[in-house]
Design a protein with these regions (language model features):
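Short glycine-/small-residue-rich Rossmann-like dinucleotide-binding loops
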Residues: 116-118, 153, 207
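Redox-cofactor binding/interface segments in oxidoreductases and associated redox assembly factors
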Residues: 112-114, 150, 204
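Rossmann-like NAD(P)(H) cofactor-binding subdomain of soluble oxidoreductases
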Residues: 120-186
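Internal alpha-helical scaffold of NAD(P)-dependent oxidoreductase catalytic cores
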Residues: 19, 165-181, 187, 192-228
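Hydrophobic/small residue at the entry helix of a nucleotide-binding pocket
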Residues: 45
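Conserved N-terminal Rossmann-fold NAD(P) cofactor-binding segment
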Residues: 3-4, 8-36, 55, 59-61, ...
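Conserved N-terminal Rossmann-fold NAD(P)-binding element of oxidoreductases
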Residues: 38-40
Length: 228
């Protein structure tokens, strides 16, 4: 992104732009579809989400550690039963969807949705090691103005208590230098009536500006968005 700064801070030895300039620019890019969208985790939640973004004109990068998943998508094929391969193929062919194992790709993105697994432990608590690993990757490549949304199923407070402190180790601050939000995934695999697009989505942010930005983004490809 390119910005005209009015208010700046020092980050990595250089001046960067603070909100609200970052907000205006990201809103503009979201609305005109020039924002580069990314999804971390290409399972039954992440891949359908990436496709909905691509349907609405976003250029989407899917990031997954599985070489098999990445190669399958880039061949224009699906590995999820209720996701047709012809849809994947269409968006790969027109360069709206690509998959990569390169974690550094997050630094090129304007929006990042975290859709990694959170399997239950024996005590029924969610295993958050995949979330932590994903957030640490983002921390290492984060830049001002990015929108980061946690979708993985977890307990209330995870975004503020776990995700935010890790990201802020970068020296940037949520709600000031980047946007941080949570929107719990609600997909029902195999349900032909209610799918990613038409399942209402609750969206919350660590600040009101973060919530506003996340809601704006989701409204581009989700029929009903409920800010909280």
């Amino acid at each position: 992104m390119e910005f005209r700064a009015e208010t700046t801070l020092t980050y990595g030895g250089r001046n960067v732009i603070q909100l609200p300039n970052l907000a205006r620019e990201l809103k503009r890019r979201i609305k005109n579809r020039s924002a580069k969208a990314g999804v971390m985790g290409l399972g039954y939640v992440g891949l359908p989400l990436a496709l909905e973004m691509a349907k609405e004109g976003f250029q989407v990068t899917g990031i997954d550690l599985s070489k098999e998943k990445v190669d399958t998508i880039n061949r224009g094929m699906s590995y999820i039963p209720d996701v047709p391969s012809d849809i994947v193929s269409a968006f790969v062919s027109n360069d709206r969807l690509r998959a990569t194992q390169s974690l550094g790709a997050v630094g090129e993105l304007d929006t990042i949705n975290i859709c990694v697994p959170t399997p239950l432990r024996k005590n029924k608590d969610p295993e958050l090691s995949y979330v932590v690993a994903a957030v640490e990757v983002i921390r290492n490549h984060i830049r001002p103005g990015q929108l980061i949304v946690l979708e993985s199923t977890t307990y209330p407070g995870t975004t503020r208590e776990l995700v935010m402190p890790i990201l802020e180790e970068s020296g940037l601050r949520a709600g000031t230098d980047f946007f941080l939000a949570y929107s719990p995934e609600r997909i029902d695999p195999g349900n032909s009536t209610y799918q990613t697009r038409n399942i209402p989505r609750v969206v919350g942010g660590v600040t009101s500006r973060c919530a506003e930005m996340a809601a704006l983004f989701y409204r581009q490809f989700i029929e009903k968005v409920i800010p909280v």
